[in-house]
Amino acid sequence: MKFVDSAKISVKAGDGGRGCVSFRREKFVPKGGPDGGDGGRGGHVYLRANRQLSTLLDFKYRKSYIAGRGEHGMGARKSGKNGNDVVIGVPCGTVVRNAETGEVLCDMVEDGQEIMIAKGGRGGQGNQHFATATRQAPRFAQPGEKGDEIELEMELKLMADVGLVGFPNAGKSTLISVFSAARPKIADYPFTTLVPNLGIVRYDDYKSFVMADIPGIIEGAAEGRGLGIQFLRHIQRTKTLLVMVPSDSADIAAEYATLLRELEKFDASLLSKPRLAVITKMDIAPEDFAIPELEPGIKVIAISSVAGQGLKALKDELWRQISTSTQITVDDAGN
């Protein structure tokens, strides 16, 4: 399935039905009073988060959602039926904005979370409501109100516990394939990963966490270079970051510093998240390879996904950070 993480749609709630102008006409009651019924309410439009969905692909093919119109009122005080509501399913992690103003309308985080995004118009009142002592036969009724109409911009930010960050060919996809059942494309050339991948990592029989692999970022990513910049938002919700540098890097410390700098340029709050430094591809490292200290207070773990070296220690440390994290994954600005 193609991965799509942004979309723009229009939604229109149903208009209310108009009230009825009618008068009671029965045998022996040739001049009965007004009995026009009310119009039905227009259908509402709702958004509902669904954990079974993982992409905004559907919105690339369907751009407009319109709820049902309320039925018009009828005689004999009969009200029209309400219009049919429309419920739009979105993946968990979808941020919804008003396309015109940029205002964040909702952040769909929890499975089953539902919000009314466009309210249906009220039905108009029938002429039965307008009879008075001096106006006993009103020949008018209310029209129905218009339903809300709005353009929406939707942006998906994946819900994961751990975000993998590294240059192309840092070994991110290999790690997630070893840790989980995810099967990303793996090859020995840059930008093998073209879309984010999610993997569920089993820690023991009853514990697990979600890991997100995004396309590799390069120096200048925050200014739009490479592929990773368009997917960096998918690590904004993570509880911890795994900053990965391969053992065969020409300058491990410089590469690590560049990665942190690109993260800070994109969103400075990313550096406030707990993180681990990981030296990958230890199976090809020379025997005298010395594990560097990359940053004060940040633990460095050396691994080989191919040989299985250091993976248990890495998994243990990730679980420790995740289980003790107080990271708030949804911010007020929807960033």
From Swiss-Prot:
Residues engaged in binding GTP: 166-173, 191-195, 213-216, 280-283, 304-306
InterPro entries: G_OBG, GTP-bd, GTP-bd_Obg/CgtA, GTP1-OBG_CS, GTP1_OBG_dom, GTP1_OBG_dom_sf, OBG_GTPase, P-loop_NTPase
GO CC terms, sorted: cytoplasm
EC number: 3.6.5.-
Positions bound to Mg(2+): 173, 193
Molecular functions (GO terms): GTP binding; GTPase activity; magnesium ion binding
Essential cofactor(s): Mg(2+)
Location within or outside the cell: Cytoplasm
Family, as annotated: Belongs to the TRAFAC class OBG-HflX-like GTPase superfamily. OBG GTPase family.
Quaternary assembly: Monomer.
HAMAP family recorded: GTPase_Obg (MF_01454)
Job of this protein: An essential GTPase which binds GTP, GDP and possibly (p)ppGpp with moderate affinity, with high nucleotide exchange rates and a fairly low GTP hydrolysis rate. Plays a role in control of the cell cycle, stress response, ribosome biogenesis and in those bacteria that undergo differentiation, in morphogenesis control.
Protein name according to UniProt: GTPase Obg
Gene name of this polypeptide: obg
